[in-house]
Amino acid sequence: MGLILAFAVILLSTCWFLWYSRKAVFDRLPPGPRPLPFLKSRQELRQTRQWEALDDLHRQYGPLVGMTWGGRPAVLIGKREIAKDLFGKRGSIYSSRARLVMGLDIMTGGDHVFFLPYGPKWKKLSRIQATFLNRPAVKHYRPLQELESLHTLQDLLHSDDYEACFSRFQASLTHALAYGTRLHSATDPQLTELENIARTFISAATNSHWMVDSFPILKYVPACLAPWKRFGQQIHAQTVSLFQGKMAVAEHTRSWNWVKHIRALKHTSGVTDHEMVYVIGSIYQAGVGIITATLRLFIMACVLHPEAVKAAQDELDRVVGSDRLPTLNDLGHLPYVEAFVKEVLRWRPLVLAATHSVTQDDDYRGYRIPRHAVILSNQWAMDMDREVWDSPEQFRPDRWMSDRKRMPSAFGLGQRMCAGQYMAMESLLIMASRMLWAFTFEHAWEGGKRVEIDSWAFHEESLFLVPKPYRARIQPRDPHRLHVIQSTWQAAEKDIDPLLDQIGREIHTASA
């Protein structure tokens, strides 16, 4: 009896200590919903229209909201100036990632750049990515981006499956740069395989309900007893097999590509093949889906806001004329077109919140943010902030005209900004400028009735939004522009080996 009593006292004391310690941590967080059930705050966000739930938290508690995320203390940021303070001025301690055991350890073998904590490995792999994704390097990709966008215009003349056309565009561009070969058709089996891998990975890795992320000790449960672990290991094996196969082919192509570029870098002798899989593969996984979804939003904005389309087309007609397609070199003279793309990114943010983690205790605005707390940057709130944006619910490209250097929050802030932001922005700009130059955008009609578009209809995948399918009518602006597209495509050089070799020489010369 005495032993049982002693055990009970120890157990109760331990529970009290854990409760008191946890309460002390949460009492010093910013105001917010306090956790009664262990996972309550995060579960409250698992509902449709999560952006409304996040906005409600800021309306109730202010720009800094204390909450839980997988049982861990978390802070939700709703103001851009606060995010710039923490991720910029205090970036040395706010540039890590919340530990996602499923996404990093199990599904990617500890090497996915996006999920890596701030430290030596992340710095090493990020430096490698920067050698071919920095702003000067990306400018050398313009001829290839123009070829792929021209191909996409040709596809749009014959297909109303815009998602497939846009997916092929960015996938082929990335595939050509990474592995030295293009994807010529939206029905290419390689594209289907890549899309399936990327979609499954993003959906699973960013899922907010893996118990192993809340209880990391579950990582050590044998796979035979854990279906979720077998699932993650299967995705890992499929991803490594797919991308290692592509790397092997890339090393024997005739032209320059990212694989050969990384192999030739002097400081990459210690980089493993497994790390290379994710140095390159993570760019594909993160970029293709977001670019595709953003271009679908672009079409939606064009249909719903014809006055903005007219202003952009007037600018294109003045600068470019009707006898040739716009190029990326024209963009310096197309401020409204650039503003149009930025407004698409702000108008309907596709990333609800980006997750960071703090590596040491910090005091900010009178609150204590504990070490390893999850820091969520609420990009939706920042892009819809009425104190920053006049009538933020309206689509108004002119709001970007006064400061062309200003960038939307879609690419993040601080040291964990999207590594591919420059390439992504140029892809969006070349596609948007050429579609605005070439096409009219109207509602579809069915049975004599106009088919309406709901601009708030999204599929929600954890903290990512994907526009639901909608119908639109896209037609050439006039027969002359149709002829320009077709004749330019017929005359275009389709062999990309000379293009890639030229890119390689220019990047090598610039870095020498």
Curated annotation (Swiss-Prot):
Null allele phenotype: Impairs the production of trihydroxy confertifolin and deacetyl astellolides A and B.
Binding sites annotated in the UniProt record for heme: C418
Signal peptide positions (record): 1-23
Example GO molecular function: monooxygenase activity
EC nos: 1.-.-.-
Signals that turn on the gene: Expression is regulated by the secondary metabolite regulator cclA.
Keywords: Heme, Iron, Metal-binding, Monooxygenase, Oxidoreductase, Signal
Gene3D superfamilies registered for this protein in UniProt: Cytochrome P450 (1.10.630.10)
Pathway in which this enzyme or protein is active: Secondary metabolite biosynthesis; terpenoid biosynthesis
Top-level taxon of the source organism: Eukaryota
Listed cofactors: heme
One Pfam family hit: p450
GO biological process: terpenoid biosynthetic process
Record has Cell membrane as a keyword: no
CDD domains: CYP64-like
Record's keyword annotation contains Flavoprotein: no
Protein's job: Cytochrome P450 monooxygenase; part of the gene cluster that mediates the biosynthesis of astellolides, drimane-type sesquiterpene esters that show antimicrobial, anti-inflammatory, and anti-tumor activities. The first step in astellolide biosynthesis is performed by the sesquiterpene cyclase astC that catalyzes the formation of drimanyl pyrophosphate from farnesyl pyrophosphate. Drimanyl pyrophosphate is then dephosphorylated by the sesquiterpene phosphatase astI to produce drimanyl monophosphate which is further dephosphorylated to drim-8-ene-11-ol by atsK.
Family affiliation: Belongs to the cytochrome P450 family.
Name of the protein described by the UniProt record: Cytochrome P450 monooxygenase astB
Upper lineage: Eukaryota, Fungi, Dikarya, Ascomycota, Pezizomycotina
This protein's encoding gene: astB
